[in-house]
Amino acid sequence: MRRIVLVILSLLVLDCPSGRSSPPASPEPYGRVDPIVQRIVAAISEERIAENLRTLERFETRHTLSDPTHPTRGIGAARTWIFEQFRRYSPRLQVSFDTYYVKKQGQRLVRDVELRNVVAVLPGTRQPERRIIICAHYDSLAIVRGPDGQVDWTQTEVFAPGVNDNGSGTAAVLELARVLSQYEFEKTLVFIAFAGEEQGLVGSTLYAQKARREGQIIEAVLNNDIIGSDVAGDGASANRVVWVFSEDPADSPSRQLARYVKRIGELYVPSMRVEMIFRHDRFGRGGDHTPFNHEGYAAVRLTTPNENFAHQHSATDTFANASPSYTALVTRINAAVAASLALAPKPPVVTTERGMPLIGRGRSGYAAHLRWRNESPEPDLAGYVVVMRATTAPDWEREIFVGLMNEYVLEGVSIDAVTFGVKAVDREGHESLVSAYVIPPRPRATFETSEPPQREGY
């Protein structure tokens, strides 16, 4: 093994690199715009997104339990149209229904139902086993209340256009499939329109659980849910901001993906600000990213900060109250992130085979000694980047390109006061997700006790 030693005089190096170091590889082959990804982002069409939104509205309802046999109305007509759109985009897209038979249960599944997710797979060329999922739910809901004010969940055929929730996400996934399917990527891209979200994340839960059982390697899940409005019910507007929700804790796979979305999204769509929200979702709400997080995959939700709650789950969630221009901006962020990940090398492994972090205090006992593994490095791998931040900082604060090393030592830096990670970069500057060094949870201890021994004379 080779080693680079960087002497850091104080932790202020996170903000001011005044320490003495061995020179890293130069120039740094990352942090720049790829012309191919730039073309992909530019190809996203607001007009096509608007056309998709109008078509989805014309189905009148996409309720999961609506009539699946009607040719122009309801969930069946909608999923057939989505299926055919995927097929039209490219012969390289492998399009299928992911079908489940779900029993009547709970409040919202008022009868047995055949549930169909619509899936389009664009196989990767070099690492086809590694998957990037771009998804949204295509079902809709309009709530009807009875005379007593309680929700009548049996009303499955009422007008429920669902343009913002979630025709907007569905239109984005369709447009992303159209554009990205014209290119080749090292990893596999999977475009999914989920059903049953409004009944409790049913379609995504069943898909994520199946993926885990099958041992699928899902590197990232970008869930788009409610990305179609840029004016809130109180008149507030932030049409150049998108929220990205991610799962705790601070260095979870989900949180690393959120940081990646911010970094790459703002690089390729500089007119937008990606605002990371460190919660799994909004209060009282849920999304199709959550089942993937439950299965240990990195998943995030992209959503508008400007939702009009008066239109939520109602007959007024129409195209007239939507903003295709805002949806297009969020779709471009998706395009940049998905393409960059699909072209990037795989993340390095920073744990042992038993899951222990490959981090220590070095020979001095007062250093940060980082190690990582890559069993099969890509032929175009340029090297690795060590990233670090204060434990209280929301995002990475310093990066050091170390080249084709598999360990790195920072003298005088406490591993207890700084969070570290490593990412891989290729010669074209494509960056992997960061693999963070995480302290494994300390197991809860239990101790047996007994009654005090009896002593004579007491």
Per-region residue spans from a language model:
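Conserved aromatic anchor
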Residues: 366-380
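His/Asp/Glu-rich mid-to-C-terminal helical/loop segments that flank catalytic regions of hydrolases
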Residues: 307-354
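Metal-dependent peptidase/peptidase-like ectodomains
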Residues: 194-291, 295-301
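A non-catalytic alpha/beta surface segment that caps or lines the substrate-entry region
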Residues: 25, 48-123, 273-275
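Short beta-strand segments within Ig-like beta-sandwich modules, predominantly Fibronectin type-III
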Residues: 398-405
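Alpha-helical metal-binding/catalytic segments enriched in His/Glu/Asp
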Residues: 120, 134-135, 139-140, 145-200, ...
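Extracellular fibronectin type III
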Residues: 427-458
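Beta-strand-rich modules
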Residues: 410-431
